[in-house]
Amino acid sequence: MKNVIDILKDSYSRNWITPRDGNISYKLEGAKEFYITPSGVRKQEINNSDFIQISMNNDGWEQLNNFNLKPSGEIELHYEILNSVTMEFFVVHLHPTYIISAMYSGLNLPDLVKDFPELSRYTKVANNTDLVLPLSKDLAEQCKTNLSYHNESQNFNFDIVGIPNHGVVSIGKSIFEAYEHIERLEHISKIVLSSNKI
């Protein structure tokens, strides 16, 4: 959990989230439970003991601990993705400035990066979702659909998806892998927006 906390603090230092924004979840290989950041806790002050354990089944999810806290309001998003995979897996939802600016300018993120093949070597960018409400089941389902789960490989075809006027969801087999997808896409978004070609 220390690495997850470090990522949240780094995101806050980059102004990618305000104190109570952003959420991260993860599950261990073969587990029927996952852990998620709580709602309303300042991310720069979060501790290991604040994480909430969630059980999963095909009918939904159930909170198992820390009943004085609520799981992130985006729990449906995390449940939809983590309930699909059996491997160790991480889901990161943040609000990076330049990526959101690019989408607000009308760009579909895969179009933004197609002139930058170095990014595509490591990060596969899905089509943006529609303009969907935060915390909604619709947001959760669109993110999972656009990330494109592949049954045979039991993995997703894409690594990151943008939510217009909101943020991104990035996934990976480690917290660093998921976070690096955001770092790469944010870097390219900054380059494109700085070029004044939009």
Language-model-detected regions and their locations in the chain:
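Glycine-rich flexible loops
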Residues: 1-198
